[in-house]
Amino acid sequence: MDATSAPHRIPPEMPQYGEDYHIFEMMQSMLEQLLIHQPEDPISFMISHLRRNNDNVPRVVILGPPASGKTTIAMWLCKHLNSNLITKENLLEREFSLLSLEAKKHYQVYKRVPNSTLVSLVQERLNEDDCLRRGWILDGIPERREQALMIQTLGLAPKHVIVLSAPDSVLIERNVGKRIDPVTGEIYHTTFDWPPELEIQNRLIQPEGISEIDTAKKLLEYHRHIIRILPSYPKILKTISSDQPCVDVFYQALTYVQSGHRCNAPFTPKVLLCGPMGCGKKLQAALLSQKYGLVNISCGQLLKEAMAAESSLGDLIEPFFEKRMTVPDSIITRVLTERLKQQDCIQKGWVLHGFPRDLDQARLLNSMGYSPNRVFFLNVPLDSILERLTLRRTDPVTGERFHLMYKPPPTIEVQARLLQNPKDSEEYIKLQTDLFYRNSGDLEQYYDRAIIVNGDQDPYTVFEYIESGIINPLPRKVT
């Protein structure tokens, strides 16, 4: 590169390509695996790693006290994510494994498995092809801090650790009524989850060691070990209360497992705000611009600026404004392209609102090479929109704007001279809102990773939701 031609500017296509294909994350993952496994032939190792394409498979650890429901949640997660459930029981029952046979004999005599043996069983299972391809969910493993450290030393690092918690009194009550279906392995309860089928009821069995005294002993042992395990997973740990319906626990666990952790990859926000008029797009765009320095791009404002500048594009726009007609998409995209390709948008990122309004415009924006990496739909009921807009008034003398409910005029004299913008009439608002929602379904389907935000709340609460959606990685879709 010629040093005399500085300053050098990276073409905008390069970071866009890296972001689209997750180049940074891919290189980071390969480097991690190289340092963990230290292969003699790094090139062949990296090629096989790329062919495996398993960076995003679930690697989850679920911990919790007896009767917390961790096995049920783990089974549901496995079915939903098409992953492999790994428990101490199925590790001991594996066929064609000498290690499992030895561990089972030891367990039958001493009622426990040595730490090193259990970790070796875990390593053996996780290195099998189905676990490499589809990921794994460890149920109740590790049981002790020593096991957690040994697993980490082997480079078997989970991406998400879920810890279920509930009061001991609740857990004891649950455990006493626990029943197991020997055919399917499903867990039922005499009070909370009794099967309706008589056939299943008749074959249920009561597991050993679920009396109140036995459960209290197990809880005591669990509490003694869990406080030493948790510091091993400081940044990937989430505690979920299991003293709630099982479906709610599962939903929280699934949401966490599908979420990604923050990455060090370079990220330039390109935000699109969609919503009906009066939903607060302009305010949210201004707040994002103020806090993060994003370039605030209002499509309508851009068209007015182009017309005021008396440019060639402005001459094309002016007749449509004078006749109050919709500006053609071809002209709008030319104005947008001129703005989005400027250096401040490339360096700082941007927040766009007012375009696209329908599916064709969304496809047009994407074909221009300016697809957003965060899309938010602000949903507000029509009643709230009417309340926000129809009560707006302007003082023609001072230019000050009022709202008859939230910011009333100070005197009767001022109130008497207030005027309403024709665009704030109820008929016009209903027409525009109906037009937006007629096209919003196609837009939401096109931007299938968009985030839906309830815009009918305090604007700073809405901003916090949008901010969270920008800062945190988008949740992964289950295929």
Swiss-Prot record:
Region (Adenylate kinase 2): 269-471
Assigned keywords, A-Z: ATP-binding, Cell projection, Cytoplasm, Cytoskeleton, Kinase, Nucleotide-binding, Transferase
List of residues binding ATP 2: G278, C279, G280, K281, K282, L283, R392
Residues the entry annotates as binding AMP 2: M325, T326, V327, G354, F355, P356, R357, Q361
Chain positions covered by the region annotation NMP 2: 298-327
InterPro entries for this protein: Adenylat/UMP-CMP_kin (IPR000850), ADK_active_lid_dom_sf (IPR036193), P-loop_NTPase (IPR027417)
The enzyme's E.C. designation: 2.7.4.3, 2.7.4.6
A cellular-component GO term for this protein: sperm flagellum
Annotated stretches, region: LID 2: 391-424
Signal peptide: none
Annotated residues for binding of ATP 1: A67, S68, G69, K70, T71, T72
Span list, region NMP 1: 87-113
Main location: cytoplasm
UniProt-annotated binding residues for AMP 1: G140, I141, P142, E143, Q147, R203
Subcellular location: Cytoplasm, Cytosol; Cytoplasm, Cytoskeleton, Cilium axoneme
Region span, LID 1: 177-206
Chain's role: Nucleoside monophosphate (NMP) kinase that catalyzes the reversible transfer of the terminal phosphate group between nucleoside triphosphates and monophosphates. Has highest activity toward AMP, and weaker activity toward dAMP, CMP and dCMP. Also displays broad nucleoside diphosphate kinase activity.
Subunit structure: Interacts with CFAP45 and CFAP52; CFAP45 and AK8 dimerization may create a cavity at the interface of the dimer that can accommodate AMP.
Annotated family: Belongs to the adenylate kinase family.
Name of protein: Adenylate kinase 8
Gene from which this protein is expressed: Ak8
